[in-house]
Design a protein with these regions (language model features):
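C-terminal cap of thioredoxin/glutaredoxin-like
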Residues: 5, 147-222
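Sec/Tat-exported extracytoplasmic proteins
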Residues: 62-65, 80-83, 110-114, 123, ...
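Solvent-exposed loop/turn segments at secondary-structure junctions
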Residues: 65-68, 95-99, 125-130, 162-163, ...
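Structural microenvironment flanking redox-active thiols in thiol-disulfide oxidoreductases
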Residues: 85-145
Length: 222
């Protein structure tokens, strides 16, 4: 389990996830399953309902300013290429403070404008490599203009009810899931998986796949 980011920074020193303190690893209990609750994943106390019950829902909680989220992107891309049709994936931005809420609004604005796929790598690159935090109004206007989005169009969508509501919903989800660090993967609103020492970045999506299959078996028998 990870811990909450107290001061947003590009220079995060945690080993596996964007967090400010370590948590003692829980002892592995005897189990016939490959991965163990409390060690490799957590059960969410107050689970959320999925949008489409016919699919297993996988959601990544992330922040553009988190270098571990940036490092996870190629792993995520490979996993998505092999993602079964009965699994859905989406991103949900973290919203702990005003900077993160600005980035969450930026993300949902790009999504509403239909430029999400090209926007994500560009935003990560700008913040992580160019060290420009993309928080000022003028800076964001020019950034979106780089995607051929007119300034007034950007401003209109950025302040729209739809984008504001999306940010609010992301904030509610994050609190309900008790997210204390990113990146974190939520499986079917029930399970929380982070790149802890017990999991690591390489093993993260193996745990996700394990939980996806677990949910499929559960659905088949209920």
């Amino acid at each position: 389990m990870t811990s909450r980011i107290l001061i947003p920074s590009l220079l995060v020193l945690a080993l596996f996830s964007c967090s400010s303190e370590d948590t003692a690893q829980v002892q592995t209990s005897l189990s016939n399953e490959k991965y163990t609750q409390g060690v490799h994943y957590e059960l969410i106390d107050n689970p959320t309902t999925v949008r489409d019950p016919s699919k297993v829902e996988v959601i990544e909680v992330f922040w553009f300013g988190c270098n571990h989220c940036y490092a996870l992107e190629p792993y995520l891309a490979r996993w998505k290429k092999e993602m079964p049709e009965d699994v859905s994936f989406s991103k949900s931005p973290a919203t702990w403070n005003e900077m993160l809420k600005t980035h969450a609004r930026m993300y949902y604005t790009a999504k509403a404008l239909g430029i999400e796929q090209q926007f994500i790598p560009a935003a990560f690159n700008t913040i992580q490599n160019e060290r420009r935090m993309l928080t000022g109004n003028t800076e964001l206007e020019y950034f979106f203009m780089g995607f051929d989005i007119e300034r007034e169009k950007y401003k209109s969508v950025n302040k729209s009810f739809g984008v504001s509501n999306a940010v609010d919903q992301a904030d509610k989800r994050m609190k309900q899931w008790e997210i204390t660090g990113v990146p974190v993967i939520i499986v079917n609103g029930k399970y929380r998986v982070g790149a802890s020492r017990a999991v690591g970045t390489d093993g993260l999506f193996d745990v996700v796949n394990f939980l996806v299959e677990k949910e499929k078996r559960y659905s088949a028998t209920n």
